[in-house]
């Protein structure tokens, strides 16, 4: 008799694979084209002129940078498919009526999506190693590094997408949470620095963003680097191979570890998630005010500054921006964002009377921000 307390359910796993195979097939086809097919095409085209350095660069560049692109998008697609039952009341009730624990449902669904991605990457790069065998590439420093990089990236992006699926009961809200979450913190830092630089004496808003690592795709692409290995012959240097830098591998490993922590958080959330929250924009009552005021603040900072520049700023000379005008535009944008969030949560346009108190809080905070900036309270 099957144990109902197992953390993995084979029957559920097979059922999930049946629903996942079209996406899995498309994902596999892309990887096969990018690695073994492209490698074979290059070898055939150059007919002996294709060096080991060329092959190592193709493998590493595809695994590292191609992996960022594919994992970013397909991690979301696999998460949406694996946890699609959380966005349909009938499916949610059906899953939660199964004689298994929530942990079993979560881990089985999570591992299904992860298995599809990691198994595809494994097979693809093993085929790539077979195609490049005549060039005698180092397996671990080239193929292994490229394959490992792609796997680490897949773990992070997929785990973050799963967390986004936990936070909402609307299938179309998950991509919004996912894309915004991947750029939110450094984006807001940049906008706030720009805002402060316009009105605080002696403060430059054009310094580098300190929290860029919290935008994983934008941080990984330039920071994860491929190093060239050169050999000197007759006073000339030739690139003989490429390898993944140790620092680059540690960056990807750190993101993958963060992904596992994120997956654990998603599991803890799933254990307490109520079935009746299916269909809600925000799946947890405690997160509702965070969502409302977060949307209001982000809209105020982003859209408000754009609105001021569009209406007034482009006609002002450098250094003559109006703080009251900027705050007014930010307050207007913040109120739009707040009521838009209220409409999404309540699923109704009739939110203005009930949301008046929250709107007043948003406007008040932004006015206080303007007062603080005018007196330069930060020193």
Predicted features along the sequence, with ranges:
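Internal/C-terminal transmembrane anchor helices
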Residues: 295-298, 341-378
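Aromatic- and glycine-rich beta-strand/loop motifs that create alpha-glucan
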Residues: 1-28
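Cytoplasmic membrane-interface regions of multi-pass membrane proteins
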Residues: 7, 91-92, 170-172, 267-285, ...
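Helix-loop-helix units of permease transmembrane domains in multi-pass membrane transporters
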Residues: 82-115, 278-279
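Secretory targeting signals
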Residues: 57, 111-173, 186-189
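Alpha-helical transmembrane segments of polytopic membrane proteins
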Residues: 65-66, 143-154, 247-258, 322-335, ...
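Long, hydrophobic alpha-helical segments
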Residues: 62-91
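Terminal transmembrane helical anchor/hairpin motif
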Residues: 3-5, 42-59, 183-269, 273-283, ...
């Amino acid at each position: 008799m099957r144990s109902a307390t197992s953390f993995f359910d084979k029957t559920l796993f097979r059922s999930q694979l049946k629903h996942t195979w079209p996406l899995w097939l498309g994902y596999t086809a892309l990887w096969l084209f990018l690695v073994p097919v492209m490698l074979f095409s290059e070898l055939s085209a150059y007919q002996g002129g294709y060096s080991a350095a060329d092959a190592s660069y193709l493998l590493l560049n595809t695994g590292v940078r191609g992996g960022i692109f594919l994992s970013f998008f397909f991690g979301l697609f696999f998460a949406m498919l694996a946890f699609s039952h959380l966005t349909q009341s009938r499916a949610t009730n059906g899953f939660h009526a199964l004689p298994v624990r929530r942990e079993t449902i979560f881990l089985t669904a999570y591992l299904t999506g992860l298995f599809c991605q990691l198994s595809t990457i494994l097979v693809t790069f093993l085929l790539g190693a077979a195609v490049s065998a005549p060039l005698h590439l180092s397996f671990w420093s080239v193929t292994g590094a490229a394959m490992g990089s792609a796997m680490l990236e897949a773990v992070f992006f997929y785990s973050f997408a799963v967390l986004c699926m936990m936070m909402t009961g609307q299938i179309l809200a998950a991509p919004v949470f996912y894309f915004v979450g991947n750029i939110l913190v450094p984006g807001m830092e940049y906008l706030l620095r720009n805002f402060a630089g316009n009105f605080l004496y002696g403060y430059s808003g054009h310094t580098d963003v300190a929290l860029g690592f919290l935008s994983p795709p934008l941080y990984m692409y330039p920071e994860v680097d491929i190093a060239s290995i050169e050999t000197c012959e007759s006073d000339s240097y030739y690139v003989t191979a490429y390898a993944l830098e140790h620092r680059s591998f540690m960056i990807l490993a750190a993101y993958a570890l963060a992904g596992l922590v994120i997956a654990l958080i998603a599991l803890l959330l799933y254990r307490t998630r109520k079935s009746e929250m299916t269909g809600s924009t925000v799946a947890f009552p405690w997160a509702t005010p965070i969502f409302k005021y977060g949307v209001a603040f982000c809209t105020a900072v982003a859209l408000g500054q754009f609105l001021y520049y569009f209406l007034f700023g482009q006609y002002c000379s450098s250094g003559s921006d109006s703080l009251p005008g900027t705050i007014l535009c930010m307050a207007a944008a913040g109120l739009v964002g707040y009521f838009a969030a209220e409409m999404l949560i309540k699923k109704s346009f009739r939110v203005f009377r009930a949301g008046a108190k929250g709107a007043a809080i948003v406007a008040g905070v932004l006015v206080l921000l303007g007062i603080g900036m005018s007196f330069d309270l930060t020193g």
